[in-house]
Amino acid sequence: MEKGVEKTQIIDYDGNVIEDLKEWMIDNKLNDLGFSYNVIAVLGSQSSGKSTLLNNLFKTSFDVMNTKQGHSQTTKGLWLSYDKFDDETNNSSSFFKLKKKNKPTLILDVEGTDSKERGDNRLTFEHRSALFCLALADCVIVNLWYHSLGNFTASNYGLLKTVMEVNLELFQQEKNSPKTILLFTVRDWFEEFAPIEVVRNKILDEYINKIWKEMKKPKEAEKLNINNFFIIEVVGLSHGIIKKEDFLKDVNNLRDKWINNLRPSKYSRNIPSDGFAQYCNNIWNTIVKQSQLDIPSQKEMLSTFRCQEIKNNVINNINKEIKEKSIESHNKVIENFKEWAEKNIIQKCLDDYFKDASRYKENICLRTSQELLDYLFTQLQAIVDNNLQYIQRTLCTKFFNELSNMYKICTIEKNTFSFSRDSNLKTVKDNNKNTSHEDIKRDLLNNNQDKCVHLWSNFLYNADKLEYFTFCNFYENYEKSNIEIKTNMKNDDNLKNDDNLKNDAHNNITTHQFNYKPTLSVLSTSIYKDSNRIRNIQCGILLNKTRQTIKNSFKNMDTYLLTTKNTEEYWNNTVQLVLKLQDNINTHLTKCFINLKGTNHNNLNIYNDDMMYNNDDMVFNNNDDDDNNNNNNNNNYYYYNKNDDANLSKDENYNNKFSFSLTNEKGIFQNINNNNEGSDEICYTNALKKIDLIKNKQVYKSTINEDINNKLQNKKYIHELKNYYLDEIMDVLKNKLDEISENLATIIIQRFESVFNYDEYEQPRQWRDISMAELKKIFLKSKNYAFLIIDILQKNIKVELIDDYLPNNFIKDEIIEKGKIKAKRRIQEICRDAQYIQETGSKMSLKNVPVVFWIILLLFGWNEILFFIRMFFKLNVILPLFFAAAFIVSTFVYNGNTQALSYINKIIFYMAKNSYNFFKHIQAISNPPPKNVQKQE
């Protein structure tokens, strides 16, 4: 089809639909009319002048019969043209210009009835075309001759009956169905024959009413008359050849009547112009299939098709922008996402969609608009996910850094615990009645050790507080992604029933809430892992400091080993030391171990009483200063101000009146030695509960400190902790005893010397004044005292508490024998020295050799020294040894480091060169040339 052609065939002679009607309407700018157009069709006998009438009435160019070539079928099938009434618009007043602008009429020229060319098959096509015209047209022109009135066939009586039956069939199912204008054009009419009113009455009485009475009508239509379905108009037209001027005048009058009076203000079938082509296609296909032509169903079908088509066009137009933004969101956070999504995506797409789709059935239009929104929300969800994932990673890093920085002082603090004074925790407990909370905190933070203990004692509280701030920050950022949609909530039930939409019926604003739960799950799991990672580190530091403290306490055991004389006394002293350490750890560090090692059991509670809200903060009443609350200061409430900075690592002045529950009964912080299954689900469930509190602006009540205090009162739990402390103490004690066993010889020697070398007054013994018999007596006494330590360490008695960890005779026999041999050897040396002093009056030593002796030795041995040096250089012994040593060092120390090896080689060759020169110099000095050679020179 050529562009701009004013007519087109829509149904061919064989009854097939021509598929290019939509393109024709687009080419002729008929696609964007909305409802501002009309449709008129003409029915009548073949060669009755239908096309001629339409060409004169609407300025169309339908083919007309050439009478000089004889009567024949001219119009085959159904043809469509249009008239925009441009001439009338230009000649009318400004008011009518505005009224008539862009309101054309589509003209449907139908193949004539009673065609001899179709023969017996004509009735089928006539019925189909009549049904088609009535389904489409605001006005149906019935073209007949005046002289045929009274005839059955020529007057189109059968056609008229078909039209009326079909109209009743079409529109009886549709409520508020539009009335079809039935315009009878009586051709070749003369006023002299009969006034037009007479002709009108004849048509009404002998045709319309008679047919209506004869028709089989449904019950709901039996009491109705023809005026409920049709608007009857009768127009007489003069003879087109004999009185051509009068004919043209009558046609112009009819044209004016159509423009100003007859035509409806909008298309009565309520089919937008952009869906007219598809509607025609659906109607004709339904008629051809001999299916029941249900106009409401056809309209729904068209509405569904067109709304889907419009939706897809809108999606195709916006996909590129969404895709570009989605790619961008992989690299950075999309700033002003809410504004961009609302204006550039949602509102723009809805405006483009409703511009055309609003002309179709409302329920289908709104349902499809929800499908459009669902698609857009799905695409935007990917961008929101990328934004939230970036925020999640940032918040996880921030959480880890802040919690790590908060406990950084505990990592760098290397001093062991001092149990010589009351612990800071006990001080808090004892002074709570007389000292303000701020004064207590100021005292607690006087030194790093107290800070560490205080931080460890509140690890769960600190982690939970930081976690809550993190969730608040996450939800605040998430809310910036939610989109507000302006919609007519009165009609849009689909939007009302959407779980992701929050409706504000007063302002007709719907807020779409994107899904944040997958990202929240990742965030909660990451916080759980980071918290436990830091918790494990701090627990390790606490254990190491505790073990080092225990180890330092056992240092005095070395000194006690030198003086102890009784096995029972030694081990009783050890038991007392163990019990003291156990009690000190239990008194000072139990709360730390509960926070860092023990399993936490807490319930999440929601506190709703005595609190007030405004739009920015969650505010609550908390009477911390009341006397009634002094003994119950662990029931703490929390509120979040979105303007607060969550940088808790810098906040050293937090207090216990703000506390948070971190877990359900299973606990978010499980025992560090257990990997409990389902921990991710537990974290996610608790995160959802906290988000619900934040969303609903409910106050958060914690029972962490209360539960910890209950545990401190639980005898069974404390007993288990004490056993754990005892295990740690005994591990250190075992290591200490192993160390003592390895140094058994040294201890024996020290015990021997403490008795052998010193008298009862701890004065050094003067061996010159002691007789040999007395020396032997002292030796035996010292030896027995020294070797007594073996029996003491072997623990051959029953020792309560320690027997569960250390068996009797726990030192191996080979270690004892080895220590004895080494100790005996040294003891004998000490005894020989004493004997020598006793005999000579002084101790054997090189210091006793006179200096003169060394000078004489050097003078007499000078030749031997030079001979020894010359021998080494002559045999080249020094250089090979030096090279071998250098090679070994370079191989073991700098293996693989070629640069270091090159430096070593340079140094070796330099030293070798100088050593060789030195060797030549020594040879020259040692072997002077003979005197006769010197004289010859």
From Swiss-Prot:
The chain crosses the membrane at residues 849-869, 873-893. It is found in: Endoplasmic reticulum membrane. Residues 34-280 form the GB1/RHD3-type G domain. Pfam families: RHD3_GTPase (PF05879), Sey1_3HB (PF20428). GO terms for biological process: endoplasmic reticulum membrane fusion. It is an enzyme of class 3 (hydrolase). Keywords: Coiled coil, Endoplasmic reticulum, GTP-binding, Hydrolase, Membrane, Nucleotide-binding, Transmembrane, Transmembrane helix. Residues 870-872 are lumenal. GO terms for cellular component: endoplasmic reticulum; endoplasmic reticulum membrane. It is a multi-pass membrane protein. Its EC number is 3.6.5.-. GO terms for molecular function: GTP binding; GTPase activity. Residues 1-848, 894-937 are cytoplasmic. GTP binds at G44, S45, Q46, S47, S48, G49, K50, S51. Residues 319-339, 725-750 form a coiled coil. It comes from the Eukaryota. HAMAP family: Sey1 (MF_03109). Belongs to the TRAFAC class dynamin-like GTPase superfamily. GB1/RHD3 GTPase family. RHD3 subfamily. Probable GTP-binding protein involved in generating and maintaining the structure of the tubular endoplasmic reticulum network. This is Protein SEY1 homolog.
